[in-house]
Design a protein with these regions (language model features):
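Conserved active-site segments centered on acidic
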Residues: 2-75, 79
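Structural signal for conserved beta-strand scaffold positions within catalytic alpha/beta enzyme cores
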Residues: 9, 41, 86, 105-108
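Conserved small-residue
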Residues: 14, 58, 84-85, 132
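Short glycine-rich anion-binding loops that position phosphate/pyrophosphate groups of nucleotides
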Residues: 15, 89-92, 111
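Short glycine-/acidic-enriched loop or helix-start segments at secondary-structure transitions
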Residues: 19-21, 51, 92-97, 116
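Alpha-helix boundary/capping residues
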Residues: 61-62, 88, 159
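ATP-dependent NMP and nucleoside kinases share a basic, alpha-helical "lid"
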Residues: 76-103
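Phosphate-binding/catalytic loops
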Residues: 95-161
Length: 161
C-alpha cells in the first residue's frame, strides 16, 4: 500500500472552518478507501476549544467530533504534507503559511464563529459545512496520488467553487 495522501487544513483559530475541513477529509477520505487520505488541522492562534456549533453541525451530518481540541501550527511543524489548504477569509484575517508542503492552496471562507446569535450561527456553520463538503468531494475525486506538485496545486485550487 502506498503512503496516505496527507492534508493539513489551516486557519487562525482552528475552532471552526479548519476543524470541519479536517473532519470531512478524514471521514470522506476513509469512505473512498481506508488509509488513502490523512488529514489534520491547526491554527496560527488556536482558540481554547472547538466551537460548539462546529461540533453540532458535524454531528447533524453523522460525524462525531466531541473531545477535539484546537491545535497550533507549531504542533505540526516539521511534518510533511502533500497539500495545505488555508480556509481563512483573506479580507478579514491573515492566513497562516506552512512551509515545505508539496502544494498549498487557499479556499477562503468567512468565519462562521463571528456569528453570535444562535440562529445566525447555525446558518453560518451550515453554509461553511456545505461549501467545504462540495470542495472536499471534488478534491477527493481527483487522482491525488498521481498529480505532480504543480498539477495538484492547480487542481486543488480549481475546486474552490
Amino acid at each position: 500500500m502506498t503512503a496516505p495522501f496527507r492534508v493539513l487544513v489551516l486557519c487562525t483559530g482552528n475552532s471552526a472552518r479548519s476543524q470541519i475541513g479536517e473532519a470531512l477529509l478524514q471521514t470522506r477520505g476513509a469512505a473512498r478507501g481506508a488509509g488513502r487520505v490523512t488529514a489534520l488541522s491547526a491554527g496560527s492562534r488556536p482558540a481554547p476549544r472547538v466551537n460548539p456549533y462546529a461540533v453540532e453541525t458535524l454531528a447533524a451530518h453523522g460525524i462525531q467530533w466531541d473531545g477535539r481540541t484546537p491545535k497550533s501550527i507549531d504542533d505540526v511543524a516539521g511534518e510533511a504534507f502533500d497539500l495545505v489548504i488555508t480556509v481563512c477569509d483573506n479580507a478579514h484575517e491573515a492566513c497562516p503559511y506552512f512551509p515545505g508542503a508539496r502544494a498549498q492552496v487557499h479556499w477562503g471562507l468567512p468565519d462562521p464563529a463571528e456569528e453570535t446569535e444562535p440562529a445566525a450561527a447555525r446558518h453560518a456553520f451550515a453554509a461553511t459545512f456545505d461549501a467545504l463538503s462540495r470542495r472536499v468531494d471534488a478534491l477527493l475525486a481527483l487522482p491525488l496520488e498521481s498529480l505532480d506538485a504543480a498539477a495538484l496545486r492547480t487542481a486543488a485550487q480549481a475546486v474552490h467553487i
